[in-house]
Swiss-Prot record:
This is Cytosolic Fe-S cluster assembly factor nar1. [4Fe-4S] cluster 2 binds at C208, C263, C464, C468. Residues 432-444 have a biased composition (Polar residues). SUPFAM superfamilies: Fe-only hydrogenase. [4Fe-4S] cluster 1 binds at C20, C61, C64, C67. The lineage of its organism: Eukaryota, Fungi, Dikarya, Ascomycota, Pezizomycotina. It comes from Aspergillus fumigatus (strain ATCC MYA-4609 / CBS 101355 / FGSC A1100 / Af293) (Neosartorya fumigata). Belongs to the NARF family. Component of the cytosolic Fe/S protein assembly machinery. Required for maturation of extramitochondrial Fe/S proteins. May play a role in the transfer of pre-assembled Fe/S clusters to target apoproteins.
Length: 597
């Protein structure tokens, strides 16, 4: 697969394959059978049928295996800034800021109401991209987003209803929850003897939707290895809709959740059937008609700029300071609010990487449980492949793990994990497909032996080279030049007028600038209050207390709130189809225009 890639293909999405399940061309209209069967009709008399334009919904793309991901055009047309504006103008905002509103006691809506509660979640990679673009700190980028989504000078300054977002949360909080649960999952897998509810070793991270879509459609033997945990985006959606629905007495359908992410494939994730209220809601509160998504819409960092432009707003002109208390609405539960909007959320270090630090956290947990142990790092064939071995005080390997970023490296990992080829000859031994690859693996004198894939306990897998700060939806250097011509003087020596296409060196420098903003989130945190460092095990205990409190508050088991499932997507290309059933299936899919259910 990698042999046919070109420079134009090195982005976050792959255009639709030729085996798409929706027709995009119309055949000539058939003449009525009542006419003379012997009549000769000239070709120019045959008029094409006047059919409506073919549309491919995001749900259709997920039901098809002709491609790895959907096209950028499909993604933007279904989940974009236009959908955000249309939704804000279509529904009035439920009033939560009135004097009669009290925490957890005032019911603000009903199933018959047309109002909506608008909430948003923002990825730290988005803030880093904005910070690099406008030459501000990551904290100031947070203020900019809050002012735009919630403040009086942002979205609330226009539109039919003057709507804005009631709460904007940082996905870092739910990322920490996923990190704690990931360490539990890896520990249970190592101690398990093959429980059906646990993934097989090695456990592969599942937070990257591009990687998940690739595995489901091309390598189903990988699915038993995938972590069952939801991503921070999905867990944020489940948290917001379950808590607000319970506390405010509104159905999940009246809570509209927008996620701002660095990646186009996050739109795919939001459209999964497994990530709706049916997966977690109780019998008495779940939707009676159609499932409600945990994340209603996903836009990328670049689309956030487009959203501001569509409303005639300039993001850098917004106040780079916190919103006044009069513009903030208290969260229904004070205990959850103190955790959700806590300023002590852990930031990122260079060692943890740019994609959430899943592997780094697991290594820290196991190192804390084994005093005197040390982590030995060995770089792979490129910077996006790194192997880790936790060595005991007696230099015995305790734990092996790895990081694989980018589809080229992912394919090498998949080949390592591919089951042994069973010979058809009687008495022949099965041959592992990765033996030759292992012989070619370079060895360092002081490093631990390289892993074969199967001996890893955990692997952090991300589709984008360089990780999530390099997501396909991030602001590119050419976009930043147009947005702020003077903000990139140190990155580009050219004048902002008619600037040439960025060179690879300039693109690497730009990505390094985004990474720097991402890693500096802790150093520019608001205020000068210093807190005592919390050990990784103590922080894990705090996270588990929060998760247990959430589960008890909504009266739903944590297993239904935080975990999900995956399924093989089979190709029907070239198979004999039952015409009536196939027609019904296509008609059903065609009715799901706009990514609906």
């Amino acid at each position: 697969m990698s042999a046919i890639l070109s420079a134009d293909d090195l982005n976050d999405f792959i255009s639709p394959g030729v085996a798409c399940i929706k027709p995009v061309e119309s055949l000539p209209q058939k003449e009525s059978q009542s006419e003379n069967p012997y009549e000769v009709t000239k070709e120019d008399k045959v008029q094409p049928e006047n059919l409506p334009p073919a549309q491919i919904s995001l749900t259709d793309c997920l039901a098809c295996s002709g491609c790895v991901t959907s096209a950028e055009a499909v993604l933007i047309s279904l989940q974009s800034h236009t959908e955000v504006l249309n939704t804000l103008d279509s529904y009035p905002e439920l009033p939560l800021g009135s004097t009669s509103y009290q925490r957890g006691t005032q019911k603000v809506g009903s199933a018959d109401s047309d109002g909506r509660i608008f909430v948003a979640s923002v990825s730290p990679q988005v803030r880093a991209s904005l910070a690099a673009t406008y030459g501000i700190t990551e904290r100031e980028a947070k203020y900019m987003i809050d002012q735009f989504l919630m403040g009086p000078h942002g979205l609330r300054a226009g539109g039919k209803h003057g709507n804005g977002f009631t709460w904007v949360v940082d996905t870092n909080v739910m990322r920490e929850a996923v990190l704690a649960l990931t360490a539990d999952e890896v520990t249970s897998s190592l101690l398990s003897t093959g429980s059906g509810s646990l993934p097989k070793s090695p456990i592969l991270s599942s937070a990257c939707p591009g990687w998940i879509c690739y595995a489901e459609k091309t390598h189903p033997f990988i699915l038993p290895h995938l972590s069952r945990l939801k991503s921070p985006q999905a867990l944020s959606g489940t948290f917001l809709k379950s808590v607000l629905s319970k506390a405010l007495g509104v159905p999940p359908s009246q809570i509209w959740h927008l996620a701002i992410m660095p990646c186009f494939d996050k739109k795919l994730e939001a459209s999964r059937e497994e990530l709706t209220d049916i997966a977690w809601a109780s019998t008495f509160t779940q939707s009676q008609t159609t499932p409600v998504r945990d994340v209603d819409c996903v836009i990328t960092t670049r689309e956030l700029l487009t959203l501001a432009t569509a409303r005639g707003l300039s993001l850098p002109n917004l106040p780079l300071k916190p919103l006044p208390a009069s513009c903030l609405t208290p969260f229904p539960d004070q205990a959850l609010e103190s955790f959700l909007f806590s300023k002590s959320s852990s930031g990122q270090t260079v060692e943890s990487g740019t994609s959430g630090g899943y592997l780094h956290h697991v290594l820290q947990i196991f190192q804390a449980r084994n005093p005197g142990s040390k982590i030995v790092t060995q770089r792979g064939r490129n910077a996006d492949v790194v192997e880790y071995v936790l060595m005991s005080s007696g230099d015995e390997p305790l734990f092996r793990a790895a990081r694989y970023y980018g589809f080229r490296n992912i394919q090498n990992l998949v080949r390592k994990l591919k089951p042994a080829r069973v010979s058809r000859l009687p008495g022949a031994k099965p041959q592992a497909v990765s033996s030759s690859a292992n012989r070619r693996q370079p060895m360092s004198r002081n490093a631990a032996p390289a892993g074969t894939g199967a001996d890893y306990a955990y692997v952090e897998v991300m589709a984008c080279p360089g990780g999530c700060t390099n997501g396909g939806g991030q602001i590119r250097i050419e976009d930043a030049r147009e947005a702020v011509p003077n903000a990139l003087k140190e990155t580009s020596t050219e004048t902002p007028v008619a600037a040439p296409k960025p060179t690879p060196h300039e693109q690497r420098a730009w990505l390094a600038r985004v990474d720097e903003a991402y890693y500096s989130a802790d150093s520019d945190s608001e205020g000068s209050v210093t807190t005592e460092p919390v050990s990784v095990l103590s922080r894990d205990n705090q996270i588990h207390e929060f998760l247990n409190y959430w589960s008890e508050k909504v009266d739903i088991p944590l297993s239904r709130l935080a975990y999900t499932s995956y399924r093989e997507v089979e190709s029907d290309v070239g198979k004999t189809k039952n015409a009536p059933n196939e027609t019904a299936r296509v008609v059903e899919l065609a009715g799901k225009i706009g990514g609906g259910w």
